[in-house]
Swiss-Prot record:
Subunit structure: Consists of two subunits, CofG and CofH.
One GO MF term: 7,8-didemethyl-8-hydroxy-5-deazariboflavin synthase activity
EC numbers on record: 2.5.1.147
Protein's name according to its UniProt entry: 5-amino-6-(D-ribitylamino)uracil--L-tyrosine 4-hydroxyphenyl transferase
Required co-factors: [4Fe-4S] cluster
SUPFAM superfamilies listed in its UniProt record: Radical SAM enzymes
Catalyzed reactions: 5-amino-6-(D-ribitylamino)uracil + L-tyrosine + S-adenosyl-L-methionine = 5-amino-5-(4-hydroxybenzyl)-6-(D-ribitylimino)-5,6-dihydrouracil + 2-iminoacetate + 5'-deoxyadenosine + L-methionine + H(+)
Reported function: Catalyzes the radical-mediated synthesis of 5-amino-5-(4-hydroxybenzyl)-6-(D-ribitylimino)-5,6-dihydrouracil from 5-amino-6-(D-ribitylamino)uracil and L-tyrosine.
Name of the encoding gene: cofH
A Pfam family that the UniProt record links to this protein: Radical_SAM
Binding site for [4Fe-4S] cluster: 61, 65, 68
């Protein structure tokens, strides 16, 4: 049974690390029930989704992340015309957002990112640009001889609306030193998103879990996100991302050592703990039908999640690492999946404003 004082702190938005560790020892469905009650109080029974398009413009990358299956030595780099074609398809499908990210090209300068933004805004100024991770921003800044602040200001001036809060992985340096030693440090990621928020660029917050991380690491990550949000208010959502262990070095090592990927119960516990730790700070917790599958994503709606993500149209990163739930889904199917949980589907925009 969950102690009353832990429940009280959960409803107040002051759950501690110790509380979270205690909750993990509770019978899982009691934990899920508490998270679901907090979700209902925070956001009600609406479940949101977005009609969007994912565009991964290159899989060429100088990075050395051990969890990546997307990077390819042969590689591709979409031309601006190819990107424009994909944006046109997004427009025709009714997308309100394009999410554009790519690998770290050697010596890429900010000009490419500006050209990509202009490719969207020149023809479809109404489409929201949700583009470029904190890692990409830092990479472009360094190659261009600019500060991160100058880079963010330039991107915003050329049409950047919001940023994905990817490249966070686990915000614990001892974990990052194993899984992505050449990536941003914990503090560099924090500094980049904090600066973006203060410049008026909202971001999402993500967490990729289930590799070499512990529950303590995951809790510390979520509490770090909470601290940033208390300072800036710039996160629109929190998105847990379950590690996909196929076709990458970390996954191969896990299999050799007989360590299994996340169980479904672990995935659902993540949503519950995130909802409880982030209560009163971040309202929107997104589940991933791509990574979890449609049925487990439905279950996440009973464990604290309130958003089903996007239609995507294409998805390369998770599918290359073993995700088998598809790369695209229609708005109609998303609504059907949501209604099956006795919740009300609501189409939203990137900033969680209702469209219909």
């Amino acid at each position: 049974m969950i102690p009353d004082e832990i429940k009280e702190r959960a409803y107040q938005g002051t759950t501690t690390k110790e509380d979270a560790l205690t909750l993990l020892e509770i019978e899982p469905f009691e934990l899920f029930e508490l998270a679901d009650q907090i979700r209902a109080k925070a956001v009600g029974d609406n479940v949101t989704y977005i009609v969007n398009r994912n565009i991964n413009f290159t899989d060429i990358c100088i990075g050395t992340c051990g969890f990546c299956a997307f990077k390819d030595k042969k590689g591709y780099l979409l031309s601006i015309d190819q990107i424009k074609d994909k944006i046109k398809e997004a427009h025709v499908s009714g997308a309100t957002e394009v999410c554009i990210q790519g690998g770290l090209l050697p010596n890429v300068k900010i000009d490419l990112y500006i050209d990509i933004l202009k490719a969207v805004k020149s023809d479809y100024p109404h489409i929201h640009t949700h583009c470029f991770s904190p890692m990409e921003v830092n990479h472009a800044a360094k190659a261009s001889g600019l500060s991160v602040e100058e880079t963010l200001k330039t991107l915003k001036a050329n049409g950047l609306n919001t940023m994905p809060g990817t490249a966070a992985e686990i915000l614990v340096d001892k974990v990052r030193n194993i899984i992505c030693p050449d990536k941003l440090t914990r503090q560099e990621w924090i500094d980049t998103v904090t600066l973006a928020h203060k410049l008026g660029i909202q971001t999402t917050a993500t967490m990729m879990y289930g590799h070499v991380d512990t529950w303590e690491d995951r809790i510390e990550h979520i509490l770090t996100i909470r601290r940033i949000q208390k300072d800036t208010g710039g996160f629109s959502e929190f998105v847990p991302l379950s590690f996909m262990p196929y076709n990458n070095p970390i996954g191969e090592k896990m299999m050799e050592e007989g360590r299994f990927m996340n169980t479904g119960i672990d995935d659902l516990k993540i949503y519950a703990i995130a909802r409880i730790l982030l209560n009163t700070h971040i309202n929107n917790i997104q589940t991933s039908w791509v990574k979890l599958g449609k049925k487990l994503a439905q279950m996440a709606l009973y464990c604290g999640a309130n958003d089903m993500g996007g239609t995507l149209m294409e998805e390369s990163i998770s599918s290359s690492a073993g995700a088998s739930s598809g790369e695209a889904i229609s708005a109609e199917e998303l609504e059907w999946i949501i209604r099956a949980t006795d919740r009300k589907p609501v189409q939203r925009d990137t900033l969680y404003r209702s469209i219909r």
